[in-house]
Amino acid sequence: MEVCLPNGHQIVDWINNAFEGRVSIYSAQQGWDKTISAQPDMMVCGGAVVCMHCLGVVGSLQRKLKHLPHHKCNQQLRQQDYVDVQFADRVTAHWKRGMLSFVSQMHAIMNDVTPEELERVRTDGGSLAELNWLQVDPGSMFRSIHSSWTDPLQVVEDLDTQLDRYWTALNLMIDSSDLVPNFMMRDPSHAFNGVKLEGEARQTQFSRTFDSRSNLEWGVMIYDYSELERDPLKGRAYRKEVVTPARDFGHFGLSHYSRATTPILGKMPAVFSGMLTGNCKMYPFIKGTAKLRTVKKLVDAVNHTWGSEKIRYALGPGGMTGWYNRTMQQAPIVLTPAALTMFPDMTKFGDLQYPIMIGDPAVLG
């Protein structure tokens, strides 16, 4: 059968779903089970099922496909053309499982706090609840330099529901107690620059997620890797060291109504932009332009393998390149949540070297 390209809005959904770890993937070896990494034969792209050998639409979610349908396939796409999308999806899926371990254990610790302990911290200051992230999930793929993004995913039932439930309950506990956590913060205007993945996706080895400054990476609000030097293999420049609000702004503050998460897993800054409603979900906040960079190689590949008429029909004037450039310009608006741009009334922070904790703002500073 003849196939067509997915539409532009479906590709946008695909990118967004990749950074939520929610892309459905089919492989001949594993079927629709993505817990074991395998080369995809099909992916779900905005409600359409697309062939990953040509990016043609071969079906929809209304019909559960059990094999790759026979179709007129140009077989010009290679895994390296879309591996960035696959990488973002799988790393985020690993990240969410790690964050579930973290928030569930912090929630359990907070549940054990007695009214007497809470009153003592309110009166005298100090830490009320403390958690060493490095002991939370010893089996996490992020614990070892030898781990790979292709490592098997832990099977978790209703992952998103559990994350939302624990995260919401933890927020309510913190807010109702007027406490300050050191793993939450608000987006200070446009200071956050999304995410730049360290290393190309096809490099299967993660660089170590924590080093001699492990507390800084795991217990602090890290939000960016700044550009510094150009790497010809990556095509753009990177600064290898992390950037923190304290480093960028000097002393940086935090209040009990700030929102975001650490620890940072797999070099993916998990920063939550404040929604206009004040509500924050358990997903990494990643700038739209960073999301779009994940499909740059795919854009180039599709331009070479599809006729300009079909591309123009699916994506409008200018084809893939035109769609890519237009969406890049709109990305901060159409692909990211609205950000609150006010600084809260903040507690001052210095080097932020202490572990993940919840306590009194007068002492945490």
UniProtKB/Swiss-Prot annotation:
UniProtKB keywords: Capsid protein, Host cytoplasm, Host nucleus, Host-virus interaction, Inhibition of host innate immune response by virus, Inhibition of host interferon signaling pathway by virus, Inhibition of host PKR by virus, Interferon antiviral system evasion, Metal-binding, Outer capsid protein, RNA-binding, Transcription, Transcription regulation, Translation regulation, Viral immunoevasion, Virion, Zinc, Zinc-finger
UniProt superkingdom: Viruses
Keyword Signal tagged: no
Keyword Metal-binding: yes
Transmembrane spans: none
Post-translational changes noted in the entry: Cleaved during virus the endosomal proteolytic disassembly of the outer capsid.
Upper lineage: Viruses, Riboviria, Orthornavirae, Duplornaviricota, Resentoviricetes
Annotated GO biological process: regulation of translation; symbiont-mediated suppression of host innate immune response; symbiont-mediated suppression of host PKR/eIFalpha signaling; symbiont-mediated suppression of host type I interferon-mediated signaling pathway; viral life cycle
Family, as annotated: Belongs to the orthoreovirus sigma-3 protein family.
Zinc finger (CCHC-type): 51-73
Cross-referenced Pfam families: Reovirus_cap (PF00979)
Location(s) in or outside the cell: Virion; Host cytoplasm; Host nucleus
Job of this protein: Stimulates translation by blocking the activation of the dsRNA-dependent protein kinase EIF2AK2/PKR, thereby inhibiting the host interferon response. Sigma3 prevents the activation of EIF2AK2 by competing with the kinase for dsRNA-binding.
Gene3D superfamilies: Outer-capsid protein sigma 3, large lobe, Outer-capsid protein sigma 3, small lobe
GO molecular function annotation: protein serine/threonine kinase inhibitor activity; RNA binding; structural molecule activity; zinc ion binding
UniProt-recorded name of the protein: Outer capsid protein sigma-3
Any single GO CC term annotated in Swiss-Prot or TrEMBL for this entry: host cell cytoplasm
Subunit structure of this chain's protein: Heterohexamer of three sigma-3 and three Mu-1 proteins. The RNA-binding form is probably a homodimer.
